């Protein structure tokens, strides 16, 4: 994009200047509307989410066998919610703003199998593909006990098929580990940002890791290209996959059940704010969709991105979606938040969800590292940098008086509010790597 075009973009959309300057920004979305009005844009329904949940239930006996760590949840891949009151006090002091209500952490960082939110969508799409192949071959019926898939016969069957994906790390981990376990031959095309330990772990599972010196977009494009020339190769498209999206969306109803068990109320007078780190958008988009179906207009989803990779904010704010990349306006897309190092957002997710998201904000790498250190210090919870992106959210909302006023969030309602920070990864980070993260925190 030349200087004239960038200047025109700034004139039309002034916040672009702040993004170019790598400033931390908060933007509340004027297009946000009710579930009733916003839902038709998604093109998916409650029934689609119910079908996804049913499929995961069918596969639960298989997952119990293949991954013994899932046995305590009976083969269902789900994470805990924990209260983090000491961190809440630390955030109030750090940002100089009162954060009323309760602050909770959703520990997708500690999901079994791959230790990140991607264990939801990535694993679900692999299972969907495996089921389809086995059904078509007459080897499986939906009424069967799916633990039969954990056998040499099925591994032999799946070995003739290939799976490919492009990833900055976590999606590749979940798809690679799951595909290899089933017996597929799998290639993960990894961008320059991907951490060495993630590549190493994948190779230990027998995954073919293809490395690129360029960013996420190139890795995805190359993965797609490889799959196109091979009729037996299935490409999992993080940028445009409704199946991945649905794998994430089952989180909504499950969260509702967890809240019911913990007697956490969400209604008109008890709003729920959920802060989701965003890369290409599939994970947070799918989760936000599920949350909207579960809690309706009482849940308010806000996406968080690094200052160096604000692709979804840029796409939704300008209305250009995947028609613009952060590199087009001179932003380098280089961030320590490797899971969020994406320059061009998913057009599918942006267009599907732009009417159902309350807002977006950015934060610096230094801020993520400091919050990583604080969470470890005050709550003893260790996450990877990108998983901390949601942590400033409660302070951003609490200090945005116009947003609170427009939405009639009175002092009383905010006192009854629940703030949920979605921790997206970090449970499988090697100790020596985590020590480096903690050493980077300036607290």
From Swiss-Prot:
Catalytic activity reported: D-serine = pyruvate + NH4(+)
CDD domains: D-Ser-dehyd
GO molecular function: D-serine ammonia-lyase activity; hydro-lyase activity; pyridoxal phosphate binding
UniProt KW keywords: Lyase, Pyridoxal phosphate
Biological-process GO terms, alphabetical: D-serine catabolic process; isoleucine biosynthetic process
Pfam families reported in the protein's UniProt record: PALP
Uppermost EC category: lyase
EC number: 4.3.1.18
N6-(pyridoxal phosphate)lysine found at: 118
Domain of life: Bacteria
CC cofactor: pyridoxal 5'-phosphate
Family annotation (SUPFAM superfamilies): Tryptophan synthase beta subunit-like PLP-dependent enzymes (SSF53686)
Gene3D superfamilies: 3.40.50.1100
UniProt cross-references to PANTHER family, sorted A to Z: D-SERINE DEHYDRATASE, THREONINE DEHYDRATASE, MITOCHONDRIAL-RELATED
Family named by the database record: Belongs to the serine/threonine dehydratase family. DsdA subfamily.
Quaternary structure (record): Monomer.
Protein name: D-serine dehydratase
